[in-house]
Amino acid sequence: MTPNVRPLVAGNWKMNGTRASLDQIKAMAEGVKGALSEKVDALICPPSTLLYVATALCDDSPLLIGAQDCHQNDTGAHTGDISAEMIADCFGTHVIVGHSERRTDHAETDHLVRAKASAAHQVDLIAIVCIGETADERKAGQTLDILKRQLAGSLPDEATAENTVIAYEPVWAIGTGLTPTTQDVREAHAFMRDELVKRFGDAGKTMRILYGGSVKPANALELMGVENVDGALIGGASLKAADFLSIYAAYEQLTA
């Protein structure tokens, strides 16, 4: 954790979830009510088909709702895409950009991710900018070089601690059950913090840096307790309310 930084526990449902899944969001919305919500933010990013209904379900809950991607343009002939303005119109508060699955499946570049983050900022959405190295890059000892390049290329100049969150997701750890050691996480997050401070000054000291990659109830407390880890971006474990709330509850000990 970073002193004086409010943690964020975020769930990315990816291409999962139908109307029947709204029961899980209802349970999460109830589960995050209480004293811990005054210290820790909770966010779920369902598929776009559920975005508006999910925000309505959370109207009287501190549970935040966001989207998984946005187009870099406001409007236009972009079949199948969703704009940042559309997300804001559905009362979403956050949007994930640059997830490794988007970078791989859709060949998204740092330049494009940067444009998407800027589009989010234009309509007062908080951009969650994802970065991380592949297994081959890790084996080649390139982790820090990749993080430096992606931070420099993916973050727009107007990024602040208020409108931007960084999510470090080692690509090789996503959905594999593999996780880096706490020392690996500590070194990566310390490096990113230094890079953010070099570029953004004091704002870089309090930008939230999340860890993502096979986060689950069994390892949440250990991972979230690492210095400069300001929360989690959770995949599969966010699909069930019980698992998501268990990870969220790790902060009951960490913030005591």
Curated annotation (Swiss-Prot):
Biological processes annotated in GO: gluconeogenesis; glyceraldehyde-3-phosphate biosynthetic process; glycerol catabolic process; glycolytic process
EC number: 5.3.1.1
Keywords, in A-Z order: Cytoplasm, Gluconeogenesis, Glycolysis, Isomerase
Species, as recorded: Agrobacterium fabrum (strain C58 / ATCC 33970)
Catalysis: reaction(s): D-glyceraldehyde 3-phosphate = dihydroxyacetone phosphate
Catalytic site positions: 99, 169
Keyword Isomerase: yes
Assembly information from the UniProt record: Homodimer.
Residues that, per the record, bind substrate: 12-14, 175, 214, 235-236
Pathway annotation: Carbohydrate biosynthesis; gluconeogenesis; Carbohydrate degradation; glycolysis; D-glyceraldehyde 3-phosphate from glycerone phosphate: step 1/1
Pfam families named in the record: TIM
Main subcellular localisation: cytoplasm
GO molecular function: triose-phosphate isomerase activity
Summary of the function given for this chain in its UniProt record: Involved in the gluconeogenesis. Catalyzes stereospecifically the conversion of dihydroxyacetone phosphate (DHAP) to D-glyceraldehyde-3-phosphate (G3P).
Compartment(s) of residence: Cytoplasm
Domain of life: Bacteria
PANTHER family from the UniProt entry: TRIOSEPHOSPHATE ISOMERASE (PTHR21139:SF42)
InterPro entries given in the database record: Aldolase_TIM, TIM_sf, TrioseP_Isoase_bac/euk, Triosephosphate_isomerase, Triosephosphate_isomerase_AS
Similarity-based family: Belongs to the triosephosphate isomerase family.
Record-given protein name: Triosephosphate isomerase
GO annotations of cellular component type: cytosol
Enzyme class: isomerase
